[in-house]
Amino acid sequence: MIGILDYGVGNLKAFANVLKGLNFHHQIVKTEQELKGCEKIIMPGVGSFDSVMNKLIESGIRDVLSDLIINKKIPILGVCVGMQILASSSEEGSKSGLGWIRGRVKKFNFDRSDFSLTIPQIGWNEVNSTKENTLLKNLEKNPRFYFLHSYYIECEDKKDVIAIANYGGDFTCAVNRENIYGTQFHPEKSHHNGVALIRNFASL
């Protein structure tokens, strides 16, 4: 069963609709007992880094989530700020992240004389894989995904980076370390490429 983590933030129904269309057994989960029944977990996130971390802590499931991911090696997909909190820390706030992906979340910083670039980045952008990875298989060449963000992860270990995009310069937009996956873009809003990526994760 694929659990869509409900800790007060994130676009849960969109993921549920995609998984339903793909005929994967899924459930929106919010309790420790529900989490323990999951074979895979999707962790959406919308808002600021600190507010999302606070929601996760207040939900009372951070410890059981860590046990499932770090000790039992359950696959997890963090999306948008759900990916950012996989990192150790963020320029956006003072809270520590989960630290499962070593790195720091940074804000876009580029020449604002290019008026075509705004912060946040809102809209479609091309994603380029940096290595072969199961999460990104069977996508069209140079696939486009939907982004809505002002921050991105700068990974300490470049081996964790599986895809980049360009917005005033290259930035990490997808990561993977062992059973831990993350996308800065929103696959649930990205039509056929997003559906293919969610299918890849659900099929791990």
Swiss-Prot record:
Short name of any one Pfam family annotated for the protein: GATase
Subcellular localization, as worded in the UniProt entry: Cytoplasm
Function noted in UniProt: IGPS catalyzes the conversion of PRFAR and glutamine to IGP, AICAR and glutamate. The HisH subunit catalyzes the hydrolysis of glutamine to glutamate and ammonia as part of the synthesis of IGP and AICAR. The resulting ammonia molecule is channeled to the active site of HisF.
Catalysed reactions, as listed in the record: 5-[(5-phospho-1-deoxy-D-ribulos-1-ylimino)methylamino]-1-(5-phospho-beta-D-ribosyl)imidazole-4-carboxamide + L-glutamine = D-erythro-1-(imidazol-4-yl)glycerol 3-phosphate + 5-amino-1-(5-phospho-beta-D-ribosyl)imidazole-4-carboxamide + L-glutamate + H(+); L-glutamine + H2O = L-glutamate + NH4(+)
Keywords: Amino-acid biosynthesis, Cytoplasm, Glutamine amidotransferase, Histidine biosynthesis, Hydrolase, Lyase
Record's keyword annotation contains Lyase: yes
Designated name of the protein: Imidazole glycerol phosphate synthase subunit HisH
Molecular function terms from GO: glutaminase activity; imidazoleglycerol-phosphate synthase activity; lyase activity
Species assigned in the record: Leptospira borgpetersenii
Gene that encodes the chain: hisH
InterPro entries, per database record: Class_I_gatase-like, GATASE, Imidazole-glycPsynth_HisH
Biological process according to GO: L-histidine biosynthetic process
Enzyme Commission designation: 4.3.2.10, 3.5.1.2
